[in-house]
Amino acid sequence: MKKRSGFTVMARLIGLVRPLAGYMVLAIGMGLIGHLCASFITIFGGWAMLDLLGFETPVPLKAIFVCVLVFALVRGVFRYAEQACNHFIAFKLLALLRDRVFRALRRLCPAKLEGRDKGDLISVITSDIELLEVFYAHTISPAVIAALFTVILCVFIGRFHWALGLLALAAYVTVGVVIPLVTSRLSGDAGLRLRTEAGALAGFVLDSLRGLSETIQFGRGRARLDEMNARTDALAGDEARMKRVAGRNTAVTNTVILLFDLAMLLTSAALCRAGKVGFDGVLIPTVALFSSFGPAIALAALGSTLQNTFAAGNRVLDILDETPAVAEVTGEA
């Protein structure tokens, strides 16, 4: 098996999206608007509090209540539409990918497939391709949405003071880029090992079924079952380790978010005490940061979940890139 870097696998998989680029742009636009609506519902709450305390606000109180209601409804509609577009893209591409894999298998038959583990092939065609749904539905558009959302929110918060904008940028980059990269490095090749073991187990089960009569004839049923249980336990152990990594990733992400929220509150309070910003420069940037980690959290979770996906993509690309043992010659007498 050829081992490719995560970026190589990602670039190859993104290249398949080209025929559905319009739907991807639509999903990104709707997702961005939806996340902005969700964040500004909380920001409108901060402006309403300022209005009640007698501070000047950019929007009157009645308009704030109307905007909160409208934004809540729009958020729901756009969230649904974004997910519909993403999953339409994902399942269309999975069908396209399966078609390409079957074409590759026909090209490789029979010489290259004769000695290949049939159970492993079934695992690639079914579960490995199915795992790519995570990449197409929950990775490409969320990454672009997070980048655009970060720019907009950093500019919005930075309008109160440049230091607050830089702090917000550091928060988004840490949660959305640094944490998933570190988690991915710590996971190592766990995802590839898990998918390889899953394929080997599928092959073992298939061989056991096909050789059932011989197993019964030679009284090897108990030994075969013990080996199957041992392989299953090893696979479950690897999966448990990956889930522990995902759990630690979530815990670290939530802790970092709380620390940056506290840092925003303390920094804005210090600037207010120094006369650099008013009370609105404390309240609005703080609640804006509180409510705006959604896109970054979606990326933080990918540090552990994408390990399986990239491993599955690597196994699928192995089949697509495989060269036939014998070149097919047609149309020559």
Spell out what each predicted region is.
Residues M1-A38, T57-I64, E82-N86, A90, ...:
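Membrane-integrated ABC transporters
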Residues G6, G29, A38-G46, L50, ...:
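Juxtamembrane helix-loop junctions of ABC transporter transmembrane domains
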Residues I14-G22, R107-L113, S127-Y136, I140, ...:
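An intracellular "coupling" helix at the cytosolic face of ABC transporter transmembrane type-1 domains
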Residues R18-F78, G158-A163, K276-F279:
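Transmembrane helix-loop-helix hairpins at lipid-water interfaces of multipass membrane proteins
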Residues L32-F40, A72-Y80, F135, T139-V151, ...:
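Hydrophobic alpha-helical transmembrane bundles that constitute the permease/transmembrane domains
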Residues D51-V66, F156-A170, V245-N314, I319-L320:
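Helix-loop-helix
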Residues L320-A333:
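Primarily ABC-family ATPase nucleotide-binding module
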